């Protein structure tokens, strides 16, 4: 019989053999050590003998099933048809880990070379399969959808596609990311995997493929999307984490290894990396909207990805997984996972609605995750964890006919305490691969630095710096200073600034350095990854963000500094608001300082244009620059200096992929305005732009008049807003190319837009902007930020159908929604709601507490809250439509923080209920309370004619699940008056408290909230001698004015509502103490809590 390899604390008994004794050698330390010294702890011959045993296991259990043609591996050893990319990468990693272990041996008799080349064959086989699908990569860069996704399954021996898109969920971002991650690890170890420039270009395009993981709903590691298995993809934290790790690993990597050239280096968009990082850490400890906890996060937070080094967050997430998914024979993948369980109908691809309930308590248990925890313990040098999970793993091991240890794929509980084991004749290759890696580590044959040559397990600031001159992640500097260069548009502006002690430079003074807009940099990056042979176009036209514009670039001998997006003169009107620009500059500097992760200091270019100094608020800009000059911006260290003096300490990115022939003359570089005389000496000499004021006049009566009458009206009116409306009527009737006096409608509106903008007449600016179908720049990432914080967005006019943003959308899709569902009902709101969406995205990223208790941010209702606040504060004459963008942002912050200032500003209870009701804000644990009410109310809850049923709600969903919370929120939003909506929330909390304190009580009938409110109001009227005529039950309080009741203090309404609820008990036995009358939900332990905060 075969000898059994020794490992740390794990013994495997073979037929006729003895148990492997625990190895007393040290457990792998995280510190750098001399590997030769490490070897001395074991006898050389014994090491060779053990490695040879593992070589035999790898040959028999892995390489035996590798396709000799493509190099791919199947999922199960008995499968001769389907090769799986993810499983192939993990198999290759096990083979490679043994290759790494053999490299210590002087004479391995060719085994090391064979193992290394087998690894290369697999990785190149995957690459070749994907290169055949290069057209998909090209399409996916433009639109991230399943029909354009790279396939994750191929024909095992030919590498051809095997499952059409409509029959398999190929969109798995984590799969491509995993490949890139191990590609870098293996190249770093010395393997030559990438051979040609064509392949370099393709890998660069794979980077573009995964860059937008943060906004790409996919089907995840388990290939099924949402836990409901209904074909719906969703955003997965595990996919985003894998992508984040892959981007970090491959940034600046030379794919040709030590023999590489400048054109074989891979570049990563640092802003895309940062979005993936921030959204990934925001989602934790959740996996997705439907899965509150998932075992895939173990592989993301530990080996192989090590996607986060926020210790507290990582430990919280791991403990969440261990506590809720760990079982006797393995980990569940997630709760109510029906895959391979005894109740799953294998003949159907998708589940029926409500079917998940049948899988509760019958989820398969996967020993694979015991091994993952063992490997995690080795990296953390946690011997207790290693031993604990090795003991668990022993129960799941068996031996094959060769005496080799085999890890069972899964155990399926049968409901009575026993298990059905996976078929024994087939090996689960992913599990075997992990087992081999764990054994090599715990036996002391493989060091963690050999398994992880790029040191992913260490925080970025502790990793060895990659050789070369390309940017590298280094972690957060403790003494980070944001460098600032002030560029004045002209010499007279420079002279005027000097009068106030602000030293600036003109574009001429910084020469030969050029000042570019980020759009010019986008054009340069479009050359990165271009390959006509494969059909790849390079980097898509994605904006360069704040971090990207904080680098200094070297391009074909030129030095270039880019100014941030906030200084771009775009179609959308926000750039015209000086107060908003000042606030954005502060936000920009804070953002760069907080999220900078590269070596070298960030250098931010601030532009000062002549039109800025004509703005009435330019003095505030001078105050900001004076503050920056002192070296601080809201606690962030900054340094203003001459560009030539700051370059040496900047982060410099060498864009060596550019050829001189590809570089066109940059006519759009920021240029200096020259004047014959310097002129202005101070602000008092500068002519100011006037703030335009005119009466709001409606021209609705022209809707029915003929076009010639409207044209005559155009000639006779001086009102800008009237002109906007009249041109809008002509646009709707005649189209954008209709001409009036040689001027087409589009051109006339554009001219009017700029005229209104220069006058800061915001109502007219917004009206024209909407007619021109403008869209806010880079709005998509802000919507995604809202979504990953566990919220949803809706846009639309109150009283009309709303459109829900529940998944990331492209700018074109957003534009279509705004101008089809909003503009037909209110022209200005089509752009005003875009503004509010943008501000919500920014605020939730920096101040998530502002949105606590709000599950769905309904933009139409948020604007209604703003209008109510203006009325409350005595500013009825002010129209939200005519506020400046900065004022809109401040007003938004005001209504979102009502609880902080309500007492100080002496809000009445009614006013507070109106504001909170518009936002549909609920108290902590509110949705869990509704779940408990439904458990005791078989007939459900009724309000305003809307029914929230207990069945199938309780069977289809689980407590705390985002889908359930949204269903409850939909019920509340059916209540049309915000103050009534809020008092209904209070009533539900009171009912929940009554049920909680009286566990024997259950509702026999539907819980009629309108009826209880009517009863409470009647009590109030009686107590206060108010004449009140009760209405028929079907009309009860539907439209009744309860303003006096809504205005009562919280303590008084609580008393009336509680009395009314108790009265219902006394009046007709609506409560039952007989538990048999109530079909209770058994879901006590199943609690996928999604934070609604």
Curated annotation (Swiss-Prot):
Biological function: Phosphorylase b kinase catalyzes the phosphorylation of serine in certain substrates, including troponin I. The beta chain acts as a regulatory unit and modulates the activity of the holoenzyme in response to phosphorylation.
UniProt subcellular location: Cell membrane
Location of the region described as Disordered in the Swiss-Prot/TrEMBL record: 1-27
Keywords tagged on the record: Calmodulin-binding, Carbohydrate metabolism, Cell membrane, Glycogen metabolism, Lipoprotein, Membrane, Prenylation
Pathway: Glycan biosynthesis; glycogen metabolism
Family: Belongs to the phosphorylase b kinase regulatory chain family.
Any single Pfam family the record assigns to this protein: KPBB_C
Lipidation (S-farnesyl cysteine): 1090
GO BP annotations, alphabetical order: glycogen metabolic process; positive regulation of glycogen catabolic process
InterPro entries: 6-hairpin_glycosidase_sf, 6hp_glycosidase-like_sf, GH15-like, KPBA/B_C, PHK_A/B_su
Cellular component terms (Gene Ontology): plasma membrane
PTM remark: Although the final Cys may be farnesylated, the terminal tripeptide is probably not removed, and the C-terminus is not methylated.
Calmodulin-binding: annotated span: 6-27, 751-778, 905-936
Gene3D superfamilies, per database record: 1.50.10.10
Membrane topology: Lipid-anchor
Name assigned to this protein: Probable phosphorylase b kinase regulatory subunit beta
Organism of this sequence: Drosophila melanogaster
A GO term, aspect molecular function: calmodulin binding
Database matches in SUPFAM superfamilies: Six-hairpin glycosidases
Taxonomic path: Eukaryota, Metazoa, Ecdysozoa, Arthropoda, Hexapoda
